[in-house]
Amino acid sequence: MIKLKLLMKSMFLVCVLMLSMVGVSSASVSVTSDSKYFDISSGCFVLEGKVLVKTDTRTIGADKARVNLVTKEVWANGNVYVEEPQEEIKFKGGSVYASDELKTAIIKGDAILERPDITIQAEKCSFNWRTKIAEFSGLVEVHQDGKTNVYDVIQYDVINNKIIDAK
C-alpha cells in the first residue's frame, strides 16, 4: 500500500512537471516528432523521427533530438537543418546544438549554407541569429562566381550576403 501511494505521488509530480513545462513553452515553442518521451533525469523530451522544433522565427529539423523546454536548448542529429524562412536562411549538417540564451546554433558534420549566389561548406558553423553572422571553421570551401576558395575560418554576414572576414 505504501509503495502504491509513493508511485501515485511520483506520477502526480511528473504530470505536474510536464504540464508546467508545456505551459511555459507553448506560447513560443512547438515540438513534433513520430515518437517522443520525457526523460525525467535530464529534464528533456527525447524525440525520434521527423523531428521539428519550431519557434516564431526559426525551425530545427532532424532525425533525432533532445529538447529542454525550460532552458530552450536543442541537441539534434541526423539530417539536421536550421532554418529562418522569413530571412531565406537554411543551414544543413550532421548535428546541431542550439541555445536560446546564447542566440546561437552550432552545426557540425559537413555544415552547409546555400544561397542563390554562394555556397559555403565547412566542418563546423556557428550561427548567431541575433547578429545574423555565421562563422565557418575547419576546411571551409566557398563556392562563388564559378570559383572555389578554401579557408580555415570565415565570418559571413547572412543578411548582407557577404564575407566579412576570411583566414
Q: What would you call each of these model-derived segments?
A:
Residues 1-167:
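Mature-chain termini and adjacent capping regions
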